[in-house]
Each structure stands twice: as C-alpha cells, then as structure tokens.
Amino acid sequence: MENSVENSMDPRSEQEEMQRCADQITDESLESTRRMLQLVEESKDAGIRTLVMLDEQGEQLERIEEGMDQINKDMKEAEKNLSDLGKCCGLCSCPCNKLKNFEAGGAYKKVWGNNQDGVVASQPARVMDDREQMAMSGGYIRRITDDARENEMEENLDQVGSIIGNLRHMALDMSNEIGSQNAQIDRIVVKGDMNKARIDEANKHATKML
C-alpha cells in the first residue's frame, strides 16, 4: 500500500504529466498560429484584388472625364463658330439671340476651374506596427518548451504582424482612392449635365439661324 502511494506521488510522473500538457498546449498554439497566418494571407490576397479593381475603375473614370473635357472643348469651338455665323447673319444685335455664357456660372468654374482634380487626402500620423512593438518587447510569445515549435510560432506571428501592417496600409489606400473616385464621379455628373445643357442651347441657337 505504501509503495502504491509513493508511486502515485512520484515527482517524475508529475513532471511527465506537466510536460505532456505543455506539449499539447504548444501543439494547439502552433496550429492556431498556422490558421491565423492562413487567414491574414487570404485577407491580403483579397485586399490586393480590391486595389487592382479600384485602379482599373480609376482608369475608366479618367477616360470618361477626359471625354467630358473633350466635349467641353469642342463646344467652345462650336459656340465660337455659331457666334461668328450669327454676326454675319445680323443675329447678334438682339440680346435674345446671344448664346448663353455657361463658363461664367459657378458650376462651370467648380468643375473646370483651377484645381478641379485637387482632392487631397489627409495623411494619417505614423502608427507603430505590431512588428516594431514586438521587436521592442522581445517577441510575441512566452516560451515554455523552447523548441522548434515555438520558433515556428514566433515566425508565424511575425508574418501575421507584418501582413496586418500591410492590410492597414491597404485600407488607407483604399479609403483615399474611393474618396478621390467619389469626388471624380461627382465632377463627371456635373460635367455631363453641363455638356448636355450646352449642346441643347447650341442646337436651339442653330435652329433659329436656319
């Protein structure tokens, strides 16, 4: 009986049990860091795809706005020709026959004036990322087994911290790009409306001259 009691309290058995628990916890923690790394890598890939799509959308908006600007330029020339033709036909003596001066309006100056593309996003203050913080504190994990598994855990968490920092910068880039594109869309809408009104006015003026 005494021997069984002594065996049940054998320090070596307790140490082995503690080591077994430590190994189990380390294995579970290692697997968790692997899953974390996989998830942030998937998020990074999704962020890259989103930035690519935003870039392509931005190029399309640029082409659309360039088209609006070309129409505006063409209408300036058309209005000049109509005015010159009106002078030859003697139509300019009556104020009602004069073309409307669209360029004098505030809406025109807002989208075709100086700094029309000037959407300046505020620059956020620099924030220390997780990698820098961990480098200063000495690492991500508290070592227990101090073996290759904990080395991999540290490497995984270091990569996770790096990717999270990249995701943070991606999010800021997306926010700035979306804000810029929204402002550009607003300009395109105004330019489209003004071009339409300008074309309608020129058509009316040309009809009166016929």
Curated annotation (Swiss-Prot):
It comes from the Eukaryota. Residues 23-85, 147-209 form the t-SNARE coiled-coil homology domain. SMART domains: t_SNARE. Signal peptide: none annotated. CDD domains: SNARE_SNAP25C (cd15885), SNARE_SNAP25N (cd15894). Keywords: Cell membrane, Coiled coil, Membrane, Repeat, Synapse, Synaptosome. The keyword Repeat applies. Residues 9-20 have a biased composition (Basic and acidic residues). Residues 1-23 are annotated as: Disordered. Its main location: other. It is found in: Synapse, Synaptosome; Cell membrane. One of its GO terms (cellular component) is presynapse. PROSITE patterns: T_SNARE. GO terms for biological process: synaptic vesicle fusion to presynaptic active zone membrane; synaptic vesicle priming. GO terms for molecular function: SNAP receptor activity; syntaxin-1 binding; voltage-gated potassium channel activity. Belongs to the SNAP-25 family. May play an important role in the synaptic function of specific neuronal systems. Associates with proteins involved in vesicle docking and membrane fusion. This is Synaptosomal-associated protein 25. It comes from Torpedo marmorata (Marbled electric ray). The lineage of its organism: Eukaryota, Metazoa, Chordata, Craniata, Vertebrata. The gene is snap25.
